[in-house]
């Protein structure tokens, strides 16, 4: 998949660490999560114990890694980071765990992609702070138990449904990360402009925030691109007109949809009469992977009410048709109304 400026996935060019908040008090958004973490961190420090294991789950780009780093900083302990696909063997996990200091934070991104065999080794490490390893092969093989210092495992996943039940149940503090409100994103964008050292008016910040898809990572990326256009054009301070012109050049529309999103909507509308159409069929038609559609493209379209997921496939809503300048077929509106009523009765 080609790189998208509105993609919530991590991009090497996003590594501007100065834009990240350094404490829970500086962290904008996810208020309930932050308030709860403050309590748990204070209690752990008062007891002199390791914080219970934490699981952050939700769409990408919402601050899971940043919160994990802040937790370690506020606990006053070390921070180690890795990701699920990187840990291939039990020895890799053992090397990570045995090098931790007491109460350190170990962050595993994409924890749903851990090898099942690695999960089995991780269970006693999380529960009893012990590592059981098999040394050698055949008749000479023997089990070795390694005592570990108490530590905090922080897992992050964009697909909590793929976590096995035993692993999920070992996290004492599950935290759901939600998309950000426009006012929260405006505060993030305004702070980002100050950190990057350029003048941004309140209406300029609102324009960038409105197109950021409820995601701070996208907001930071759009802000840097708007800054580039403003520097070349010699415009300061950056107001809504400058931001609008820059974002239009990037093909990011008024609600944050880009060319890929509009292609997705048009494919359902024009090729399949608004749906329903299966995700595999859509992936083939758009030359994208199923995972890309489910994890990157669809979450924001669902949140905006542009599409519906049904047992028979994806359907375009009336607002989805309207956004691409088309009128929905009457029979499709009847189907959507029926599905809505069925959902309401099911609740």
Swiss-Prot record:
Its main location: cytoplasm. Mg(2+) binds at residue 65. The keyword ATP-binding applies. Its EC number is 3.6.4.-. The keyword ATP-binding applies. It comes from the Bacteria. It catalyses: ATP + H2O = ADP + phosphate + H(+). DNA binds at residues 290, 309, 314. CDD domains: AAA. One of its GO terms (biological process) is DNA recombination. Keywords: ATP-binding, Cytoplasm, DNA damage, DNA recombination, DNA repair, DNA-binding, Hydrolase, Nucleotide-binding. Belongs to the RuvB family. Homohexamer. Forms an RuvA(8)-RuvB(12)-Holliday junction (HJ) complex. HJ DNA is sandwiched between 2 RuvA tetramers; dsDNA enters through RuvA and exits via RuvB. An RuvB hexamer assembles on each DNA strand where it exits the tetramer. Each RuvB hexamer is contacted by two RuvA subunits (via domain III) on 2 adjacent RuvB subunits; this complex drives branch migration. In the full resolvosome a probable DNA-RuvA(4)-RuvB(12)-RuvC(2) complex forms which resolves the HJ. The RuvA-RuvB-RuvC complex processes Holliday junction (HJ) DNA during genetic recombination and DNA repair, while the RuvA-RuvB complex plays an important role in the rescue of blocked DNA replication forks via replication fork reversal (RFR). RuvA specifically binds to HJ cruciform DNA, conferring on it an open structure. The RuvB hexamer acts as an ATP-dependent pump, pulling dsDNA into and through the RuvAB complex. RuvB forms 2 homohexamers on either side of HJ DNA bound by 1 or 2 RuvA tetramers; 4 subunits per hexamer contact DNA at a time. This is Holliday junction branch migration complex subunit RuvB. The lineage of its organism: Bacteria, Pseudomonadati, Pseudomonadota, Alphaproteobacteria, Rhodospirillales. The gene is ruvB.
